[in-house]
UniProtKB/Swiss-Prot annotation:
Belongs to the class-I aminoacyl-tRNA synthetase family. TyrS type 1 subfamily. Catalyzes the attachment of tyrosine to tRNA(Tyr) in a two-step reaction: tyrosine is first activated by ATP to form Tyr-AMP and then transferred to the acceptor end of tRNA(Tyr). ATP binds at K225. It is found in: Cytoplasm. It comes from Chlamydia pneumoniae (Chlamydophila pneumoniae). A motif ('HIGH' region) lies at residues 36-45. This is Tyrosine--tRNA ligase.
Length: 412
């Protein structure tokens, strides 16, 4: 087995690969696709970005493909129902933004857009020169298509054709860039093998495929969402603090997989994490989360996240800016009430209204134990009320029950 493939296998990030890849000698070019279904990349895309970076470090020539054409069709992989089609202008705008993002994260990597070749193919040419090489029987047994065909909603011809378009991408890159390997998440295996078969039918030679595991929880659901929605790599959509807190809140048993897929730590460092996570999962999770955050947002983004995190500890509020409060509120830690409903009211009653405690008995006990905080200061007693001086920047109050359960109250 080639050393680069063995390195991926030792890291336990090989889900599947086609027979013969382990024996390929000489330079290898590999590609991975990113469809512009949104104006930014999300945490799931970071797996692919790290994978391309890792391939480059192992001597493979990486190519990143932006799906300017396939993004207008929609990949049915992993979807229970059909995607809503985006306007052409949206896909174009998204493609430009994602290309810029990939250029920042993957400097020096070749970037291509499949709109450059797919939009040049006429319908007749598509049916005659491409479609005739695909057999319905083979397409219908692909897991993604089979599941959708037998679902209540079914699958449209548009999404059914996605597999053919992705196969043509592989053919185009094989023919024009010498790209013999396509990589992707485990849900892309059917699309990848169809491309390999298409290249063989066109008489170009042997192509290969490789998939890595998706980031999932114990129930097999994709990880990558919070209460407020998708976890984006764009700091304007998901702040560094939100991303950091999201990573810290992931279950301890996901740490080894996160370290393998979302970082560029060496295999030796990964093995060390496997050992340390058994005895000190909190410290290991913080280490891994900070490594990821630094890679995505740089040292300044990491320091911003750590600064806000420190400010939320009891006794530390002064460094929280109005922007920090807004991001905490918008990031799923917020609730809003009219100021008239809060001023002069007992905090004991407000904590119940906001769901931070289950009963007055519970909150009285916590107040006695100095476990209820307003702006990181313990509530003096159960008769304490909300006063104007408790409101930061005219709108915000930071409430906490214990050290971990926190809420930013926005007053209208």
């Amino acid at each position: 087995m080639q050393s680069w493939l063995q390195s991926l296998q030792e890291r336990n990030i090989l889900e599947n690969f086609t027979a013969g890849l382990e024996s390929v000698e000489g330079p290898i070019a590999a590609y991975l696709g990113f469809d512009p279904t949104a104006p930014a990349l999300h945490i799931g895309h970071w797996i692919g970005i790290c994978f391309l970076k890792r391939l480059a470090a192992l001597g493979i020539t990486p190519i990143a493909l932006v799906g300017g054409a396939t993004g207008m069709v929609g990949d049915p992989s992993g979807k229970q129902s059909e995607r809503s089609l985006l306007q052409t202008s949206e896909v174009f705008d998204n493609s430009q933004k994602i290309t810029a993002c990939l250029q920042r994260y993957l400097p020096g990597v070749t970037l291509v857009n499949n709109a450059d070749w797919l939009q040049e193919i006429s319908l007749i040419d598509f049916l005659r020169d491409i479609g005739k090489h695909f057999r319905l029987g083979q397409m219908l047994v692909k897991d993604t298509i089979k599941q959708r065909v037998h679902s209540d909603e079914g699958i449209s011809y548009t999404e059914f054709s996605y597999l053919i378009l992705q196969s043509y991408d592989f053919y185009h890159l094989f023919k024009n860039y010498g790209t013999i390997l396509q990589c992707g998440g485990s849900d892309q295996w059917g699309n990848i093998t169809s491309g390999i078969d298409f290249i063989r039918r066109k008489g170009l030679g042997q192509a290969y495929g490789l998939t890595y595991p998706l980031l999932t929880n114990a129930q097999g659901k994709k990880i990558g969402k919070t209460e407020s929605g998708t976890v984006w790599l764009d700091s304007d959509l998901t702040s560094p603090f939100e991303l950091y807190q999201y990573l810290l809140r992931l279950p301890d048993d996901t740490i080894p997989k996160i370290a393998r897929t979302l970082t560029l730590l060496s295999n030796e460092e990964i093995q060390d994490i496997d050992r340390r996570v058994q005895t000190d999962p909190v410290a290991v999770k913080e280490f891994v989360a900070q490594d990821i955050l630094s890679a995505i947002h740089g040292d300044l983004g990491l320091e911003e996240a750590l600064s806000v995190t420190r400010s939320m500890h009891p006794g530390n509020l002064s460094s929280l800016s109005e922007k920090d409060f807004h991001e905490l509120f918008a990031g799923g830690m917020g609730a809003s009430l009219d100021k008239s409903e809060v001023l002069g009211k007992r905090w004991l009653d407000l904590f119940l209204v906001l769901g931070l405690c289950k009963s007055k008995g519970e909150i009285r006990r916590l107040i006695e134990q100095k476990g209820v905080y307003i702006n990181n200061v313990p509530i003096a007693n159960e008769h304490s009320v909300c006063e104007e001086q408790d409101i930061c920047y005219g709108h915000y109050v930071l409430l906490a029950q214990g050290k971990k359960r926190k809420l930013v109250l926005y007053l209208n």
